Design a protein with these regions (language model features):
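N-terminal leader/targeting and accessory segments in enzymes
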Residues: 1-100
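Phosphate-binding loop of NTP-binding sites
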Residues: 7-9, 19, 97-180
Length: 180
């Protein structure tokens, strides 16, 4: 995703929201948002260090801290304890819980919306574009997330690197739209 989202430039989120996911309750601290990519960390973000297919997020903690991360979320690592100068929040099954964590962190933005999913082999971009245009014509606020990017109110705001964005990007985008 290529964007400066609202959560990264002005809002603050309490880490204690993540207590139900963590092995121990995080200290009372605040972060501006969640980020999976250490290269995209902005000061005040929490770095979510997930083990991927090719790379392990734990290897990028130092880079995230150097870029201004104010907390790290990661799987418990009992055989290889991690020491950081910032809060380190251990969350079992982090990758599997990421959607629920992001939804909780951003105050469940989809609860304030009607969500429609469009699937299939062909025609998804056209179909979602038509739905968005219809909503606009009928004066209903709408947004589309897809191949071309995310469009709140049919106005391109963010470019996407993937057709289906990660859970954090989806939840933070929905939170931005909720707060428009």
């Amino acid at each position: 995703m290529i964007a400066v989202r609202q959560d990264k430039v002005g809002k603050r989120y309490a880490l204690h929201k993540l207590a139900k996911f963590a092995t121990k309750s995080p200290d009372c601290g605040y972060v501006n948002g969640l980020e999976l990519d250490s290269r995209k960390i902005l000061p005040g973000n929490a770095f979510v260090a997930i083990k991927g297919l090719r790379k392990n997020g734990l290897n990028y903690i130092e880079e995230a801290v150097a870029r201004g991360a104010s907390a790290v979320l990661a799987e418990p690592s009992p055989n290889n304890p991690i020491s950081t100068k910032i809060p380190f929040i251990e969350i079992p099954n982090l990758k599997e819980q990421l959607g629920a964590i992001a939804a909780t962190f951003y105050d469940h933005p989809s609860r304030n919306m009607h969500i429609v999913g469009v699937t299939g082999t062909n025609g998804k971009t056209t179909t979602t574009g038509l739905i968005g245009q219809f909503a606009s014509i009928t004066k209903r606020p709408s947004g589309v997330i897809g191949t071309l990017g995310s469009f709140p109110k049919n106005d391109l705001k963010f470019g996407m690197n993937n057709t289906t964005p990660d859970a954090i990007t989806i939840q933070s985008t929905l939170a931005d739209w909720r707060d428009l």
